[in-house]
Amino acid sequence: MLVSSSVLKDDSSLRIFKESPNEFEYIIKRHDMDDRKEDTESKERRSTMGSSFIRFGRGQSFFNNLDNSAFDNEIDSKVSRHPRWKSPDIVIRFGRSGMKSTNDEQPKRGKNDLNFIRFGRNIQIVPTDFDLSAVCSALMSNDAISDAGLHPDVTRLFRLCNNLNKITGEISLDSLETNSNHRE
């Protein structure tokens, strides 16, 4: 839907940009704000590149409403106060990238990456690079098959592999079913 440096337009005056170097960052800009110059201090107010949160608000303290002059010195005079219909650009970052690479190796997953992404309760989505035939062959070559008291999830996985075997003929689990019938 969004390609690097592409613009997604709607009926309002907003533009949504996809930043190419970071896959988790989008920038929303207003049409008439493109020529606005930004100083470095306003950029520092935004969350830094590695952050995983979104800052909301307009940078104004609640002390602005007080008449006490002692608080006037604490309020930053460089805060730009745009009207709501001409607010500055909004940068939204969706978490951090968990892919790490060392030297010339393949990218590695970070310790916080999930193998399954859960949407709702007990609904799992398997990653796209999941190779079930490799899992089934690894389970068959494992010595844990002969052990009594397999976990119910493992037996379900064996049944799935057996059903795939009937379709493809590549994996043989008939001996497992024979062994499981003798245990019962």
Curated annotation (Swiss-Prot):
Tissue distribution of the protein: Expressed throughout the central nervous system.
Intracellular or extracellular location(s): Secreted
Pro-peptide region(s): 1-44, 59-83, 97-107, 122-184
GO cellular component: extracellular region
Transmembrane segments: none
Modification type Phenylalanine amide: residues: 56, 94, 119
Annotated keywords: Amidation, Cleavage on pair of basic residues, Neuropeptide, Secreted
Record bears the keyword Secreted: yes
GO biological process: neuropeptide signaling pathway
Role: In insects, FMRFamide and related peptides have modulatory actions at skeletal neuromuscular junctions, and peptides that are immunologically related to FMRFamide are released into the circulation from neurohemal organs.
Family in the record: Belongs to the FARP (FMRFamide related peptide) family.
Name this polypeptide is given: FMRFamide-related peptides
